[in-house]
C-alpha cells in the first residue's frame, strides 16, 4: 500500500509541474521554469500527502471488493 501512496504523490506532483511548464522554454527562460517547478513541488507535496492519507484507507477498503469482483 505504500506504493499506492507514492503513485498518488508522483501523479499529483507531475500534474502540477506540468501546469507550470506549458510550452517548451527558451534558454533564457530556464531559470524561471526551474523556479516555477520548484515552487510547484513545494506546494504540491503537502497537498499530495493529505490526499494520500485520505485515499489510502479508501483503497484498502476497495481492494477486497475489487478482488471479489475479479476473482
UniProtKB/Swiss-Prot annotation:
Cleavable signal peptide: 1-23
Annotated thermal dependence: Thermostable. Still active at 100 degrees Celsius.
Location in or out of the cell: Secreted
CC per GO annotation: extracellular region
Propeptide stretches in the record: 24-35, 65-71
Top-level taxonomic group: Eukaryota
Keywords noted in UniProt: Antibiotic, Antimicrobial, Cleavage on pair of basic residues, Cytolysis, Hemolysis, Immunity, Innate immunity, Secreted, Signal
GO BP, sorted A to Z: defense response to bacterium; innate immune response; killing of cells of another organism
Assembly with partners or alone: Homomer of four to six subunits.
Summary of the function given for this chain in its UniProt record: Female-specific peptides with potent activity against Gram-positive and Gram-negative bacteria. They have as well hemolytic activity.
Protein name, per record: Ceratotoxin-A
Organism, scientific name: Ceratitis capitata
Gene this chain is encoded by: CTXA1
